[in-house]
Amino acid sequence: MFVDQVKISLKAGDGGNGITAYRREKYVPFGGPAGGDGGKGASVVFEVDEGLRTLLDFRYQRHFKASKGENGQSSNMHGKNAEDLVLKVPPGTIIKNVETDEVLADLVEDGQRAVVAKGGRGGRGNSRFATPRNPAPDFSEKGEPGEELDVSLELKLLADVGLVGFPSVGKSTLLSIVSKAKPKIGAYHFTTIKPNLGVVSTPDQRSFVMADLPGLIEGASDGVGLGHQFLRHVERTKVIVHMIDMSGSEGREPIEDYKVINQELAAYEQRLEDRPQIVVANKMDLPESQDNLNLFKEEIGEDVPVIPVSTITRDNIDQLLYAIADKLEEYKDVDITVEEEESVGINRVLYKHTPSQDKFTISRDDDGAYVVSGNAIERMFKMTDFNSDPAVRRFARQMRSMGIDDALRERGCKNGDIVRILGGEFEFVE
């Protein structure tokens, strides 16, 4: 089964908790704090495996949860960091944040990695909070929660050549005779319902990857037929091979087929209009094909190369392969993925950090309570052990140092009013 789009849920591992402990040894009075830090939670990492050709593995498992870091231990022993969860994907996979539609990673090279959900930092043990004023702190920090998000995976096949055209024009037959690919071939429309890849070698030992895409019809760019599902795979081909049934056996005019398919390509992605193209006039073994070819050439002019072939008698197949290889040589220095990134703003950094941690907002609930939200304050809330009075006092100091107390006063918050953070309720005290 060919799967090229899927949505999955990711949960990176939480950091391990720091602990509150003290050094207790014979003959060592006032041993001091000895609580170790928690280990780092596992991140969710995507890695390219060139042996994969589909996203099928993600069809049956949609939820991925990475391991939690180990808790700290006494004697200042740190917890063990969790091992990252590595998910293998085929080359050409684009990862997007479902909520924002932001491109998080574009993975094209074997072994390339991207950290998509970052594991939480381990909480600090009480020995990390020792100061001259408080040499034996009696609180520690909980581990930071790992990132959690839904992402979509979209596969754009990395082929040098893309075969496009109406259904039943001979695309699958051509791929089957020039490579070892075994696409399904039948005398009915949409026999091909998934892309097929084949490695093609020319008689002079040049090679390239060719993709046979499901047949397009008018309106494909708007979702008609199967075309819209698979047009994305054309985006990364360096050369488009446009196959046309020159016999007109389906009752369509060859020149109209040519115009309709090009209109659909341009409507889907404007850049495809300028992609190098070779026209293949197929079924030249049938009556009327030569007359139609002459009229076709008169109509489109000499700018677009037209190569007459027959996939049944295999006439001119070698000439076609030479023409494709020559065209690829001509455009070998063109990086389609870079062109695409510049066009749509794809970001290929390994990890995109969340900006501006210190900002916060204050709003009011219907019952009059003040609601404080923001990355930094919510992170501190999650990492605070509210069963520990010293930890609660530290949290209050952090709120003051961030300016949240002053901001609440400016909004009219008075002594005894309710303040909420992530569902937790506090009483404002002057």
Swiss-Prot record:
Q: Which cell locations does it reside in?
A: Cytoplasm
Enumerate the residues binding Mg(2+). 172, 192
Region feature Disordered, mapped onto this chain = 118-145
Instruction: Tell me where in this chain the Obg domain is found.
Output: 1-158
Q: What is its EC number?
A: 3.6.5.-
UniProt-annotated binding residues for GTP:
165-172, 190-194, 212-215, 282-285, 310-312
Q: Name the Pfam families for this protein.
A: DUF1967 (PF09269), GTP1_OBG (PF01018), MMR_HSR1 (PF01926)
Q: State the Gene Ontology BP annotations.
A: ribosome biogenesis
One annotated GO molecular function: magnesium ion binding
UniProt subunit comment: Monomer.
Q: Which family does it belong to?
A: Belongs to the TRAFAC class OBG-HflX-like GTPase superfamily. OBG GTPase family.
Protein's name according to its UniProt entry? GTPase Obg
Organism expressing this protein natively: Staphylococcus aureus (strain COL)
Query: Gene for this protein?
Result: obg
